[in-house]
Regions:
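Proline-centered turn/helix-capping motifs that create local helix->coil transitions or kinks
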Residues: 100-110
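Long, hydrophobic N-terminal alpha-helical segment
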Residues: 23-30
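Alpha-helical packing segments of well-folded alpha/beta enzyme cores
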Residues: 8, 15-19, 81, 85-99, ...
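Short, contiguous alpha-helical
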Residues: 9-13, 30-75, 116-169
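Residues within well-ordered alpha-helical secondary structure of globular protein domains
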Residues: 25, 48-51, 91
Length: 169
């Protein structure tokens, strides 16, 4: 495995360890509580991270079927325990490791397109969505970098929310 892939997985695993620690400290009620009606709960962020990682790495890079309901990731208000959220995140990570383990250094420059459902694309892009295809095309390297940055961003939010809710993280 290339140095970038190894480093990328190390970074993703570091973030997952942080999320694990947060989820171990919180009740199901805390995991699904929102600071504001428009805000996301820790549960929403975990489901969103699992969906995004699956779409970018497992499906986009790894070629598995596209299975994602992005809008539901933010509308959920419960239904998964902290343990079930951890299991979901780890299941996706295991699939990501499998997909990335098959790549060579040369594969990192291959371009991969990710399709989005039109309603998700419009929600993400706003008025700019009218003029573009609901698709993101970038190199595998780019998808990996995006996933690492995205995961770290939301991990920071999860850690902050955990502290706000009284967890130690």
């Amino acid at each position: 495995m290339s140095e970038l892939l190894t480093f990328g997985l190390e970074q993703l695993n570091t973030q997952l360890t942080r999320i694990d620690g947060c989820l171990r400290e919180l009740t199901e009620e805390q995991v699904w509580s929102r600071l504001t009606p428009q805000g996301n709960s820790i549960g929403n962020l975990c489901v969103h991270l699992a969906g995004s990682e699956y779409q970018h790495i497992v499906s986009g890079i790894g070629g598995k079927p596209f299975i994602r309901e992005r809008s539901q990731e933010f509308s959920m208000s419960g239904g998964l325990t902290p343990q079930e959220l951890r299991e979901r995140l780890h299941a996706v990570r295991n699939q990501s490791c499998e997909a990335l383990s098959r790549l060579t250094e040369q594969d990192l420059d291959k371009r991969v397109s990710l399709l989005f459902k039109l309603e998700d694309w419009q929600e993400m892009k706003g008025s700019a969505a009218r003029d573009t295809e609901p698709c993101v095309t970038r190199s595998i390297r780019g998808h990996l970098m995006y996933t690492i940055e995205h995961y770290a961003n939301h991990t920071g939010q999860i850690v902050l929310l955990t502290k706000w809710l009284g967890g130690v993280q």
